[in-house]
Every structure is written in structure tokens, then in C-alpha cells.
């Protein structure tokens, strides 16, 4: 008696493909039309689709990615598996809120999973045009609400956008600029990002705090934070900033990298205006400025970056000069000197002299070497074309020390003191800064005489 064939599984058809099988129709037609492609499945050709899917379930994402490179047929099989409900459930992990603290093993493992998933999609869609790749990937990822711009109700406690960013970074790594432009435009169209940016940069600062936070999180977690090479980060930051006028670029830079509240994550607009701030509040802005300046990002000249720094120092209103000085120090020697030289060339010597005073004050507070401030002043002096201009600049510095001292002394003398004596302490640091500054000038003079 002929043995009965077990029909509980769907066998891969050799002659004709059923039209009702939507996920595998393309695959079946391909096999029918070219028998050679059937051999590219190797030993898998005798397996029912369900068995192959079970095997894929036991493979790691990295192993599935390696398997997808065997042949176009195998790759198409894996794409079909990803499109199934069981495949998407297994691959699109969504435990974004079950993590206790940043940097834990669980968080690292989840990010690594999406890095591997990005590589898998990169390999499976290798032969598709960029536009088709993006459409297919969006179709799969759209099932995950936390990957959407406003898809999560608790964005500060969610790792979704970071995983999405890790996925995109791995997917697009090595793509040329034109393809990356298309990716950015696709994301902007998908999320209406440009319109949302327009809302936060054109309205009064703080009037749309929740939207500011969403823009910040999307730009940082999806577009900027996961790149290994600084040039890649500079490329994406340029895409974000360059469509806007300089004043809006500064606002957007502050939203993305400026200080935020530890309680609700919202941007603190008054931080630079109300009092001296600390390094942590300025570090993100300084790093972004250095990124654009040091990498020689396409579309940015030194003058562009300096203009951006100048514009940033009045967002939302003019900063305390101490905070401006701290930003310049954190931005590095080249940016600091170029910024100061620009003021010297444009005849703003008095303003520049006050800046020197606050550079000295920050160095005193943070225990930086005061010799740095003196040498920076000496370098800027050479920008002035005549001896009379240099002498006038040095006199302006002496006058600035006296004026700033009197400004800080007045509230102390009037008894208008803070609960924490901040004003008195600031005056104390300024007097020490002045003494150490002039000590370094004397050392410099003595060394010049002895040589």
C-alpha cells in the first residue's frame, strides 16, 4: 500500500503556488520560474514552511542575519518570516519600560538586539532601492507604538526611541550622503518633524514644553546619539539645523542640547539668565558646537559656527557673561580664540575685555590654570593691528576688573545677600581671580625680560 503523506504542514509547492498564500506568493513564483533557485535552499528545500519558521525561531537574530546572506531565495524566505505575526512578535521586542536603571544589562541587551535587527534588515533588503527599503521597514516597525514620535505616554522612562535609533544607525551605516538625505526626508515626512520644529522655534520659548521635549528626544535618541564616528553625527546635526535661519538654529540647538529639569525632562530656558550655571548644563551645547567646528562638517565654515555661538548666547535673552565664558572654555581653545578674535576685529574691545574678566573668574572657580586665560589674552592682543589698540585693550581689561568688582560689591554692601551667600562667594572668587590673573601677567613679563 502506498504510504500516506502527512498533510498537516504546507509543503513548498514544486509546480503551482496557491494564490491565497499572500506572504509566500512572491517566493513561490520565483521558485517555479527558475529551478536553479530551488537548489539555493539547500537541505531546507525539503522542509515545510512551518518547520523552517520553527527553525528560525531558535536562531539568534545575528544568526538569521548571516543566514539571509546565503542566497536571494533564503533572504526572501526570511522576509516572509518577519512579516508573520509570530516572526514580528519574536523579533520586535517591546519591553522598553521594564528597565530599572540606565546602563543595566537588560538595557544593553535590548539595544544590542536592535543593532542586530538593523543588520538583519540591512542584509535582507540589500537589493531593494532606498525608497522601497524604507517603505518596507516602516511597514514592519509601524507596529511598535514606542517608535513613533509621540507614541509613548512616558517618553522619559522609555527606551523605544533609543532602540529605533540604534536600528536606523546600523541600517544606514555606510550609506552615501544622498541615501542618508532620503532617510532624513522620509523620517521628516513620516513624523511631520519640520512642522513640529517650526512650532517650537518660532513660538515663545517654553510655550510648548511637551513638544520641545518630544523634539529633543527624537533628535537625540533617533538621529544623533548612536553614531561611532563624529563625522556621521555632524552630518545628521547639519540636516537638522541647516534648513533654518541662524536665529532658529540657535533655538533648536538649545532645545536639543540645553539644560533640562531632572524632574520632568523639560528644557530650562532661564538657566543661563538667572545665575551662574555649572559645567553639566553647558556640556551638551559645547560638544555640539565642537562637533560642527572640529569635524569640518559640510556646509559649515568657522564664521558660521562662531555666528551660531554668538546667537546662542542670547537665547532666549542675553546670558550672564560668566555662562558665556564657561561655554567658550568648554568648547575648546580654537573656538574660544576665534570667537574672541572676531570681536577684536569688529571693534568690540570693551565687550571683549569684560569677557576676559569672566574667563578668569571661571578658571578660578573651576581650578583651571590661570595661565591659560593670560595666554589667550596675549594671543588675542596680536589680532589688533596697532600698538595703540593693544594698549587700549589692556587698559579696558583693567577697567573691566574694577567695574565688575564694584557691580558684585554693591549688593553685598547694601545687605542684599542671598540665603546661600552666593553673591558674596562670587565676589570672593573674583578678587582671587584678579590677583592670580595679574600674578600670571607679572610672571609673563619677568620671563620676557629675562629672555
From Swiss-Prot:
Limits of the F-box domain: 41-91
Keywords associated with the record: Ubl conjugation pathway
Top-level lineage group: Eukaryota
RNA-binding is among the record's keywords: no
Pfam families from the UniProt entry: ARM_FBXO47, F-box
InterPro entries with a match to the protein in the record: ARM_FBXO47 (IPR056622), F-box-like_dom_sf (IPR036047), F-box_dom (IPR001810), FBXO47 (IPR038946)
Quaternary context: Part of a SCF (SKP1-cullin-F-box) protein ligase complex.
Function: Probably recognizes and binds to some phosphorylated proteins and promotes their ubiquitination and degradation.
Full protein name: F-box only protein 47
Amino acid at each position: 500500500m502506498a504510504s500516506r503523506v502527512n498533510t498537516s504542514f504546507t509543503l513548498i509547492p514544486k509546480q503551482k503556488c496557491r494564490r491565497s498564500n499572500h506572504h509566500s506568493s512572491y517566493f513561490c513564483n520565483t521558485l517555479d520560474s527558475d529551478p536553479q533557485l530551488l537548489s539555493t535552499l539547500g537541505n531546507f528545500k525539503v522542509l515545510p514552511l512551518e518547520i523552517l519558521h520553527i527553525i528560525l525561531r531558535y536562531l539568534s537574530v545575528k544568526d538569521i542575519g548571516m543566514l539571509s546572506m546565503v542566497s536571494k531565495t533564503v533572504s526572501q524566505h526570511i522576509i516572509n518570516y518577519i512579516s508573520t505575526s509570530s516572526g514580528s512578535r519574536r523579533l520586535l521586542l517591546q519591553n522598553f519600560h521594564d528597565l530599572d536603571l540606565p546602563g543595566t544589562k537588560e538595557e544593553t541587551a535590548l539595544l544590542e538586539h536592535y543593532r542586530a535587527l538593523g543588520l538583519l534588515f540591512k542584509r535582507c533588503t540589500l537589493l531593494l532601492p532606498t525608497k522601497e527599503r524604507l517603505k518596507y521597514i516602516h511597514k514592519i516597525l509601524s507596529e511598535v507604538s514606542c517608535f513613533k514620535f509621540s507614541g509613548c505616554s512616558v517618553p522619559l522612562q522609555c527606551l523605544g526611541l533609543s532602540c529605533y535609533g540604534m536600528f536606523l544607525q546600523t541600517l544606514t551605516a555606510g550609506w552615501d550622503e544622498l541615501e542618508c538625505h532620503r532617510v532624513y526626508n522620509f523620517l521628516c515626512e513620516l513624523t511631520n518633524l519640520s512642522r513640529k520644529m517650526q512650532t517650537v522655534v518660532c513660538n515663545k520659548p517654553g510655550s510648548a514644553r511637551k513638544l520641545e521635549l518630544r523634539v529633543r528626544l527624537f533628535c537625540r535618541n533617533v538621529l544623533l546619539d548612536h553614531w561611532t564616528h563624529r563625522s556621521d553625527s555632524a552630518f545628521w546635526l547639519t540636516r537638522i539645523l541647516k534648513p533654518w535661519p541662524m536665529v532658529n538654529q540657535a533655538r533648536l540647538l538649545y532645545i536639543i542640547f540645553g539644560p533640562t529639569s531632572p524632574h520632568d525632562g523639560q528644557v530650562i530656558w532661564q538657566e543661563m539668565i538667572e545665575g551662574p550655571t555649572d559645567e553639566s548644563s553647558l556640556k551638551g551645547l559645547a560638544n555640539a558646537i565642537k562637533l560642527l567646528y572640529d569635524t569640518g562638517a559640510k556646509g559649515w565654515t568657522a564664521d558660521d559656527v562662531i555666528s551660531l555661538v554668538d546667537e546662542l548666547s542670547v537665547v532666549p535673552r542675553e546670558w550672564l557673561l560668566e555662562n558665556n565664558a564657561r561655554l567658550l572654555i568648554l568648547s575648546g581653545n580654537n573656538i574660544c580664540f576665534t570667537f574672541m578674535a572676531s570681536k577684536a576685529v569688529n571693534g568690540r574691545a570693551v565687550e571683549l575685555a569684560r569677557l576676559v574678566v569672566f574667563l578668569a573668574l571661571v578658571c578660578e572657580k573651576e581650578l583651571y590654570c590661570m595661565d591659560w586665560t593670560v595666554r589667550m589674552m596675549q594671543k588675542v592682543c596680536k589680532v589688533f593691528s596697532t600698538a595703540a589698540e593693544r594698549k587700549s585693550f589692556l587698559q579696558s581689561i583693567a577697567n573691566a576688573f574694577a567695574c565688575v568688582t564694584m557691580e558684585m560689591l554693591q549688593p553685598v554692601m547694601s545687605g542684599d545677600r542671598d540665603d546661600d551667600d552666593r553673591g558674596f562667594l562670587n565676589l570672593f572668587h573674583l578678587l582671587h581671580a584678579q590677583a592670580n590673573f595679574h600674578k600670571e601677567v607679572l610672571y609673563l613679563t619677568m620671563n620676557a625680560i629675562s629672555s
